[in-house]
Structure formats: C-alpha cells, structure tokens
Regions:
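Cytosolic-facing loops and C-terminal tails of multi-pass membrane proteins
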Residues: 1-2, 6, 18-28, 78-217
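Short secondary-structure junctions
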Residues: 9-15
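Active-site scaffold of zinc-dependent metalloenzymes
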Residues: 21, 25-72
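Non-catalytic alpha-helical coupling and interface elements of nucleotide-dependent molecular machines
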Residues: 13, 63, 67, 86-94
Length: 217
C-alpha cells in the first residue's frame, strides 16, 4: 500500500497498519479502534480510482486522526464525545453524571498520571474562565474542514477533492459535501495553500503535473 505510505510521509504523520475489506464503506477508508494506528480500505478505494483521488481520501483520513489523536476513532458521535468531556471534567470538578459518563470517569481515573492530571486541571480552569461551556460541534467541523484541506494539499487538485467529497457519503458535524467544497475553493488559490505545499516539498502545481506517488498496491 505504497500510496498510503507516500501520503503519510507528505503530511508528516506515522504510516498506519493497513487492512482491506472486499465490501465498501463510507468514504472508502476508516481508522480502526486499535492500540496502534490502523486503517481499513474499502472496495471503492481499491479499484477504479486515480492516484490523486486516492491521495485526497487517504490524506483527509490521516490528517483527521492526527488532529484529534484518533479521538474520533473511538468516540465518533457527538453524544460519545460529550460523555467523554463530562467524564474528564469530573476528574477535576466532581459532579453527578449520567450513566455513560460514570463508566468513562471510572475508566479514566487510574490512567491519569500526575502530569496529565495537571494538564487537565489547567484545561478545566480555562474552560471555567470562559463560562464553563464548550460547544463540540464547531470543533468537529473545524477538524473536518482542516482534514479536507490536508487532503487537498496532498493531492493538489481541487476538482479531484470535490469529486471525492461528492461521493463520500458522510455528513460530519452537519457539513455537506457542498459545504466542504465551498471552504476548499478559496483555500486552493490562497497564498497560504501555496506556501504550505512548498514547505512540504510538493510545489504549487497539481500532483499529476509533478512527481506522482506510486499507485496503490
């Protein structure tokens, strides 16, 4: 699976373990809830895709997991994330919790070493200074839009990115494919996009006009 390794190298993230699935799955790729980073590739990415299309899909997924430390792999829905947040805050500020958060609170407690607990206390204090409210939905949206930008940076072609998003089938944080493309279009022609592509060694031309990565194999 050389395309996965190439994309990971471009984005500066670890190369995950790779598994394949004969059936299809949403987005064609997903991280697995395993101890070490691991992805599974579905049928739609294993056949009939160009290299830039593969790079966008893979880059988007790898970036998302790096941004969240794979948090969304283990807690993919808003209710699950909210329960985790409540359980984490309860380590510092004890309070009555719903049953799902109680289980998480008790599981987290023995895993928090003193340094981590100090970081958590600092984060909770900062949250309280802002009124104690944290809206997770904008955070999920920001992660998704940033991940799509990373996929675009790797593949270098806005048309490819738009095409892959159109068939992705996932709605993340309420963002449709059109919402994500509307964010990517101005970014694709921005100075910051060109600067980042130069910094990661790709250049400003579409990937198919420079040195392409190897095909998926």
């Amino acid at each position: 699976m050389r395309t996965v390794a190439w994309t990971a190298a471009v984005l500066g993230v670890p190369v995950p373990d790779i598994y394949v699935k004969s059936a299809d799955l949403l987005g064609g790729i997903a991280h697995l809830p395993a101890t070490d980073p691991a992805v599974i590739l579905g049928k739609s990415l294993l056949t009939g895709r160009s290299v830039p299309e593969l790079v966008f899909a893979i880059g988007r997924e790898l970036a998302c997991q790096r941004l969240t430390s794979r948090l969304l792999t283990f807690y993919p829905t808003l209710p699950e994330l909210r329960a985790l947040l409540v359980a984490a805050v309860a380590q510092v500020v004890p309070s009555s919790l719903p049953s799902d958060a109680i289980l998480l609170r008790d599981a987290l407690r023995p895993k928090l070493q003193s340094a981590r607990l100090a970081e958590l206390e600092s984060a909770v204090a900062a949250l309280e200074e802002r009124g104690g409210r944290l809206d997770l939905k904008p955070w999920i949206r920001a992660v998704e839009l940033t991940s799509c930008r990373a996929g675009l940076l790797a593949c270098g072609d806005i048309t490819t990115a738009a095409r892959m998003l159109a068939v992705d089938g996932r709605v993340v944080g309420g963002l449709s494919a059109a919402d994500r493309v509307r964010d990517l279009i101005p970014f694709s022609i921005s100075a910051s996009c060109a600067k980042v592509r130069r910094a990661i060694g790709i250049g400003v031309t579409p990937i198919r006009g420079s040195s392409p990565p190897p095909a998926l194999s």
